[in-house]
Amino acid sequence: MLSFSLFIPSAAAAQTEENTDVAPNQYEKKDIEIDTNYLHEDTYYEEKTELPEEQKDITFDKPKDKDAELIKDLFTSTNAEDSNTIAAQSKQLGITFAEKPMTKTSSTETEDEQETSSLLLPMIYVVLILLGIAGIVFLIPKVTAQENKKA
């Protein structure tokens, strides 16, 4: 019954009053006052106040530190050999990276390893496929024979 009333709009509609007077909004034009004086006169929008004495004494200059030179000398070194960088240590030890690293001269060992590894994977696949086929060949007749005995 409820679903039937949903499809009929007159049954679901609420009763409303017929004589509802709705008055439209009336727009009355009002004059807009735009103050453009601040565009022409700087003194109009600037607030004139005098700075207090405490703010007059404030400076933005960094005070000179007497120990700055000593600290700078501690953490900087002009001698490159005393430096603890990788470049300085490799220079002290006589290690250069300009030469190419030594490689194996015989490539037959790597070829043999590649051949055995390339043959090993297909052999594993063949063995797995043969085991799967053998399992299917032997198991399916046994299962069908057991079903025939039950029937």
Curated annotation (Swiss-Prot):
Keywords: Cell membrane, Membrane, Transmembrane, Transmembrane helix. The chain crosses the membrane at residues 120-140. InterPro entries: EssA, EssA/YueC. It comes from the Bacteria. The keyword Membrane applies. It is a single-pass membrane protein. GO terms for cellular component: plasma membrane. Disruption phenotype: Cells lacking this gene are blocked in YukE secretion. Belongs to the EssA family. Required for YukE secretion. Probable component or regulator of the ESX/ESAT-6-like secretion system (BsEss). This is ESX secretion system protein YueC.
